[in-house]
Amino acid sequence: MGVTAEDFDRDCHTDLFITHLAAETNTLYRGAGDGWFSDATNVHGLGLASTPFTGFGTRWLDFDNDGDLDLYTVNGSVSRLQDQALQGVAYPLRQRNQFWVNEEGRYSLVMSSDKAVGRGLAIGDIDNDGDIDMLITNSHGRPQLLRNTTDTLGRDWIGIELNAPGALTLGSTVELGSQECVKAIVQTDGSYASASDHRVVFGISGNLLRTDVIVRWSDSSVEQFGRLKLNRYHSLRKGRGAPVPSDLELGAVHGVSQ
């Protein structure tokens, strides 16, 4: 039901993660860069533990700004769960959500403590503090706003908002010039029946004070914005960056400013 698209393994190719019904595993499709995808679900530890659950909203996000993309999945059954029905639960469809923490490419699972009939998941930085928060919608239940209070002391970040008057910014790609293949798609869609923050946030590794950012706009033009300070948001306006030849692939231009 749900889908999220990002380059989770930092190989410059977009990957897909899709949620499914109970008795099926959710699926991670690893992009090969030539229009083909391979099923990498079990290789990255995302298969067996998802089987008992019906997944809906899902998004990749770097919750602790360590530079790795973690994964959150909102679950809720569509068929009566017998144990809950016998207990007299009004809507016996409640399931726990799943938080998958990226540990060097393989995901370890943290289960939510509460059960709900989960459906939508939107992400964004609601308090502008540089880490990603989540909003979950539940059928027959209250929405849940989860404010990120993870200790990210010593980890830097940079946030980017694109501005292209008279043109769409959705579908554009933002890449850090200081780290090859660290990129994000500007998107509000995906997940399930949800719309997320259009800004992108990167966790920064290394002892940098500033970084360059490369933007491939939705019309395929490419610009480089130099020496942006860390630990703050920047609004990048189309036409004010340094032009980059449009046939140059993302990942080929990198500059480090300290």
Descriptions of predicted regions:
Residues I18-H20, L48-T51, L86-Y91, P165:
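Short consensus segments that form the blades of beta-propeller domains
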Residues D11, D15-H20, R59, L71-N75, ...:
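Hydrophobic beta-strand segments that make up the repeating blades of beta-propeller
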Residues G35-L48, G105-S113:
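Blade-edge beta-strand/turn elements of extracellular beta-propeller
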Residues L93-Q95, N102-Q258:
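Gly/Ser/Thr/Pro-enriched helix-cap/hinge segments flanking short amphipathic alpha-helices
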Residues M1-R10, R30, G55-N65, R119-N128:
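Beta-propeller blade termini
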Residues A23-T25, V78-R80, G141-R142:
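Short glycine/acidic-enriched loop and turn motifs that connect beta-strands
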Residues V74-P92:
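Short, conserved, GDST-rich strand-edge loop motifs in beta-rich repeat architectures
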